[in-house]
Amino acid sequence: MRFLAIAALVCFAIAAPARAQTPDAELMAPIQKFIDAFNKGDTAGAAATHAAGADLTIIDEVPPYLWRGPKAFQEWGAALDMDAKKQGMTEPMVTMKAPTRTEQDGDQAYVIVPAVFTFKKAGTPMREAAQMTFVLKKGASGWLIHGWTWTGPKPTPASGATKP
């Protein structure tokens, strides 16, 4: 019986590192570059991480909620800017955690990352936890984002937030 318990512990110890493996850095690079560029307000840098083809698709909580095609990124950015002005949003920032799921089949990949969007709304710090789901394809220039979604509940005042 003791042998079985030790064998089970060894199996768990060997399996644990396999579950904790980090995704391919090359696969994650365009996602991280997109978020970094977004946080800096670098629209061109963020757009460069996305494919500019007919299959580019973005789904976000900002009206009209869905953008498709070669100009999807630019149209989404314009809608986001317009909504931010309408809502009195400033200081947008997205942070990501390690992916909770990655699937790769040759030159195509699917990645889910937990994300948090923080901003100020009329001066009040806000926080919105969500998940971002990405579809990427690898071409001659490397991995590019071909689609993504933002999914989560509505933002709430950040912990301890008070109006200015």
Where are these regions (language model features)?
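Hydrophobic pocket/interface hotspot
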Residues: 34, 46-47, 69, 73, ...
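Hydrophobic/aromatic beta-strand elements that line small-molecule binding cavities or substrate pockets
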Residues: 73, 96-102, 115-117, 131-137
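Short beta-strand edge/turn micro-motifs at domain boundaries
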Residues: 110, 127-160
